[in-house]
Amino acid sequence: MSIPKNPLILVPARMASTRLPGKPLADIHGEPMIVHVWRRAMEADLGPVVVAVSEQEVADAVRGAGGTAVMTRPDHPSGSDRVFGALQTVDPDGKHDAVINVQGDLPTISPDVIKAAVPPFGDSEVDITTLICEITEDSEKTNPNVVKAVVGLSPGNNC
């Protein structure tokens, strides 16, 4: 693959979180969490940003802030499935050459971190990139709710 010229950012969000029910609408300094995430994704300035939701109140919050939201089925088992469902609606003809999945519970994500997912596509052998960081909190190492990646790093290379 080559570096995307027309990427699409999709942000999955759902109210039925088991760890923090209602988290997309959690108030952070007077605004819903999902609005903060949408703004960070917009600030990355990579392409259109669409929030994939299954509840009207989340869509209303995003649209009220000037964003775009698309309704998805409420029974998607994961955020990745919600992104795929939204992609079928938003880009059925595949006009976007990459999809960047920014999770809806990252209100402090830096736009530069979102941008960091793009350059690896310049390598013709790369079809997917995933941003990771080293787990530094011992409690997170065994927490099943913390996503983990196993990687092989060359000497001197770190996250």
What is the predicted role of each segment?
Residues 109-159:
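Conserved core of the sugar-phosphate nucleotidyltransferase
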Residues 3-53:
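N-terminal glycine-rich phosphate-binding loop and ensuing alpha1 helix
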Residues 42, 88-92, 122:
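Residue-level signal for alpha-helix termini/capping positions
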Residues 46, 94-96, 123-127:
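Short, high-confidence coil segments that cap the C-terminus of an alpha-helix
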Residues 50, 56-102, 106-116:
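Short phosphate-binding loop-to-helix
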